[in-house]
Amino acid sequence: MRAAFPAPVLTLAIVALFLWRAAAAAFEVEEERLFPALDRGGREVSILSTTDTSVLGPVVEAYQRRHPGIAVRYTVASSQEVFAAIADEERPFDLVISSAMDLQMKLANDGLARAHRSARTDAVPPWARWQDNLYAFAQENVVLLISRKALGPLPQPQTRRDLIELLRENTALFRGRVGTYDPALSGAGYLFATQDSRQSDSFWRLAEVMGSLAPRFYTATNEMIDDIKTGKLVLAYNVLGSYAGPRLADDPDVAIVELQDYTLTLLRTAIIPATSKAPDLGGEFLDFLLGPEGKAAIRDEAGLPLIDAGALAAHPYLRPMRLDPGLLVFLDRLKRRDFLDEWNSALMRN
């Protein structure tokens, strides 16, 4: 005989099931901070970002000095969670900032970003924007970190060929002490690895050598920096130089290396999501990032390098990732699966 339940019990069960499913679907937030308005205003701009509050918080405060009546809710999540929040959950953020250029391009290409045009956006060079939907406000080199203290008299690598040779000839030093992003879990890590694979076949040889050394895998640059500072790591590959520079400026034991065969340069970008409830405020914040006061705060307080074609021309080994739909190639489901299979095989993770 089927058990009977009172209607209120059934209602509560249905509500509980709905809430459980909603919670299961919710994107994972790493940090959220409300910057209250400096003056009475009553409006709030909501920003979703992969950039830590410790980095962009001073830029938010600079924005509020210019716009004291606006409160800012700043939410931090991983690049894949940021993408899911907009693409899958349609969260009503007013501006999305991410270092994962490919995922930002997919949002824009799929019609999930609002067009925004102003005198400030018109001044962005063509290579740092896509249509009227996606704009870069910082360019950042992807670097190698290596412990000078642990390396001792051994030569510091200048190219991937040097690095491969160093790892092969000093396995005892590096075993269990090499770190890099996990491309299966980190959107930025996946972007760096796929772009590496397009630049040179040496990437796969390097991956195989790292795989033989029981490497450690990470989802954030700051975690790798923490571990190289404490000595847990001797080497960290594919680290955001913009994070490493400020944190290691006074640390003589760690070298920040821009490899001379090539060094990837990413563009940190922003979009106004189609789901925004205050796109005017999202556009206002974007214009601030692209204007003189915002640029000064980005450079001087956040420590992020500004968009600068001159820096690229002066250092021919820099390889900027192109902000165009070519970034979407490795987001194809089959290509992603094949790439991660090859990665796992090279790293002996199967």
Q: Model segments located where?
A:
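A bilobed periplasmic-binding-protein/Venus flytrap-type ligand-binding module shared by bacterial periplasmic
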Residues: 143-150, 192-194, 266-278, 297
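Mature extracytoplasmic/periplasmic domains
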Residues: 273-330
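Early extracytoplasmic/lumenal segment of secretory-pathway proteins
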Residues: 26-106
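Periplasmic-binding protein-like
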Residues: 122-127, 139-140, 206-211, 249-274
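Extracytoplasmic ligand-binding site segments that recognize negatively charged/polar headgroups
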Residues: 46, 50-51, 57, 92, ...
